[in-house]
Every structure is written in structure tokens, then in C-alpha cells.
Amino acid sequence: MNNRQLNVRLFGGTFVFNDTENSGDFFSFALDRPTDYLFDYNYYGRSEDSGLFSQQLILAEGGFKSQLEPAFANKWIATANASTTIWKYIMAYGDAGFVKNHGTNAEFVYDSGLRFILVEDYFEIFFPVYSNLGWEIAQPNYDQKIRFIVTLDFK
């Protein structure tokens, strides 16, 4: 297969000083969906917690596709994201990493699934298959676990 791809992305971050753990995770590292307090990303449902726009994915910080707990790290985070071509615009993806919060041990998190690229970097759909939560594809409300990338800001 001539058009096989392997994409690898690494992210690591630590806080030298962070005393905001009592006031929430607004400035913490995100595992799957950054808070975007500087409005750098094109979130269409910026403050949505449920519904279609809450499933929008921005590949930043942890870069995970599944919504796992802990969702944020207020001490440090280290993640790896990878995907490889299965056939044409269908890819398998996998993410793994460690999330550390104050007062708890570092937690290992992982997810995997299928990525359908309709228009690369502009319209992609992610179907989670297996993660820390088990077989996501067999769990209730699977349609709410599907993530997507939509970018209307052309480069």
C-alpha cells in the first residue's frame, strides 16, 4: 500500500506553580477538550456540556478522542497520540498517557478507535471503540461519544 501514513503526536506539560485546584480546572491541562480561555480555537459550542457541539474535538493538549476521567490535570500531563491508515481515508487511532492531579497518584489513561477523514483538518469523524471505560461501542448513548472536527476557517 503506497499511501500508508503513521501520525504520531506527543504532548507533555507541567505546572511549576498552580494553586487553582480549589477553584476548578479552568487553567488545567485538558485530556480531550481544552478550555480555550484565550479564545484561540474555533469552538462552535464553546461552553456546551451536552449536545452535538459538545462533541467537537480540538486536537490540543492531551489530544484524546474519548471523554475520560480525570478530564484535567492540575499538576502534570504526558500523552501520546497515534494513527495509521487502514484503507484510503479510514484510520485506526490510539491515545495513551498519564494524568497527575494534586493529592492523587498519576493515572494511566488510554483510548482507541476509528478515524474517518472526509476533508483532512477540516472535517473528520472519530468513532471510539475501546478505552479505560471498556468497549465504548457497546455502551449506552454511543452516539454521544462520537467526536468530530469541523473547521470553517480555511488556511
State where each predicted segment sits.
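C-terminal outer-membrane beta-barrel translocator/porin domains of Gram-negative envelope proteins
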Residues: 1-85
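Transmembrane beta-strands of outer-membrane beta-barrel pores
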Residues: 12-18, 94-102, 120-122, 127-134, ...
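Flexible, surface-exposed loop regions and adjacent strand-edge segments
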Residues: 24-31, 107-109, 142-145
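Transmembrane beta-strands of outer-membrane beta-barrel proteins
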Residues: 6-10, 90-94, 114, 123-125, ...
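Outer-membrane beta-barrel strand-turn architecture
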Residues: 1-4, 84-88, 117-122, 154
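Transmembrane beta-barrel architecture of outer-membrane proteins
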Residues: 75-79, 109-113, 145-147
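Outer-membrane beta-barrel "beta-signal"
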Residues: 114-123, 142-155
